[in-house]
């Protein structure tokens, strides 16, 4: 197998970490609040540091992580928000309950994002131990709430950027119509205003 040189890269669209002028909703689970409150504070800090105004951040509290997707979908469906940040903390127990909830929460958040078209950032911790959750809520492993906020800002920016880009189809149609106009103008004879008899 021959390895060839890497071809020139195609320009890529990327979102920017600029939350100014955008609205965000943060859905946070009250269950395991000693963890989720740390995630929430850090998520709001991330939004404000990237330019979001406090008045453009709405916080919605739900009983547990299982309720996060339904609330996120309700908020996304209003059309008021540029992105939704989903925050919760699930700790593995002795039964299969953890696996069921993790799967449903993950599926529900993803489905809400896909069906509404509003970016959703996943800030739900799924940990085996309490120590793992503590580490991810601001100690050894950073803060996943802050990371979710940055992801939400970038995806909201990317969505806005993509929305301003002409589609490939409209580019082709625009090129084709300008080509036709150019040919018609170039080869056309001036029409006489007099009628032939």
Per-region residue spans from a language model:
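Short glycine/serine/threonine-rich phosphate/pyrophosphate-binding segments
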Residues: 3-7, 36-37, 67-69, 133
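Extreme N-terminal tail/first-helix region
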Residues: 1-16
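Glycine-rich phosphate/diphosphate-binding loop of Rossmann-like nucleotide-binding domains
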Residues: 12-63
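Structural motif
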Residues: 25, 58, 82-84, 118-124
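Short, ordered loop/turn segments at secondary-structure junctions
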Residues: 30-31, 89-90, 125-129
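Glycine-rich phosphate-binding loop
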Residues: 67-109
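Generic structural signal for well-ordered, non-membrane alpha-helical segments
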Residues: 17, 32, 36, 40, ...
């Amino acid at each position: 197998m021959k390895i060839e040189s890497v071809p020139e890269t195609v320009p890529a669209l990327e979102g920017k970490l600029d939350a100014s002028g955008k609205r965000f909703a943060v859905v946070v689970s009250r269950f395991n609040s000693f963890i989720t409150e740390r995630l929430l504070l850090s998520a709001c800090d991330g939004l404000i540091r990237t330019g979001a105004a406090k008045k453009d951040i709405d916080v919605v509290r739900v009983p547990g992580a299982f309720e996060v997707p339904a609330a996120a979908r309700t908020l996304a469906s209003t059309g008021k928000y540029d992105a939704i940040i989903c925050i919760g903390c699930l700790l593995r127990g002795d039964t299969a309950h953890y696996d069921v909830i993790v799967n449903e929460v993950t599926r529900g958040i993803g489905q809400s994002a896909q069906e509404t078209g509003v970016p959703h950032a996943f800030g739900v911790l799924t940990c085996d131990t309490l120590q793992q959750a503590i580490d991810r809520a601001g100690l050894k492993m950073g803060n996943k709430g802050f990371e979710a906020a940055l992801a939400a800002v970038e995806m909201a920016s990317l969505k806005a950027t993509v929305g301003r880009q002409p589609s490939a189809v409209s580019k082709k149609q625009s090129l084709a119509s300008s080509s036709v106009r150019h040919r018609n103008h170039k080869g056309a004879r001036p029409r006489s205003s007099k009628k032939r008899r």
